[in-house]
Amino acid sequence: PTTTEEVQALLKRIGVDGVRYEEFFITSFDGDVLGLYDYLTEYENLDELNHLACLLSELDQSDLEKFEAVIDCGSHTSSVADLINLTQNLDCYEFYPDIENEEDLGRYFSEDLPIPDELKDYFDYEAYGRDVSINEGGHFAPGGYIVQTSGDFKEFYRDTKDIPAEHRVFSYPKLSIREQMAAYKEIIDGSSLEGYRKLSNKEREER
């Protein structure tokens, strides 16, 4: 998460002051959540990103690993809003850490089967794990196996109006009166110059 002051300082550093320039785009992302940045674009809303960052920072390690596994299979990743809702619906999933493949999965679930000890060396754990994965619709992600266990996925977040005030950080830099006057003068001078160029071009075309 970040703060309004940090956002203002960054915008001022790149010349986005809300007067001369208002638009910007994000060229890169950095963070510790595996795979998250594959689903973020250069035009994301800063308040939404910060809200997501705040929610992720509140997750314990096991839920964070579960979140990473879910997004690895591409579920609820079409927008930042989807990702925000996912952080609040992780109880709809079951995550099995260190289950890396079908054989691991088969061995894990076979513990509940009444397999005689003398037959365990002949049991096809990989085939059994494959059947379990197919039947459950599970996914092998970096770090473990993820499966959705509930369809009760709720939409807690719809749009930016749902962002708590304490998570809102976007604000243009605060300019002094002198800085504001200089910015407006630059805009006016630029508009006058552009108007003069258009007039000169029109006169040349008429001649």
State what each model feature region is.
Residues 29, 91, 104, 123-126, 141-143, 170, 188, ...:
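Intrinsically disordered, low-complexity segments enriched in small/polar residues
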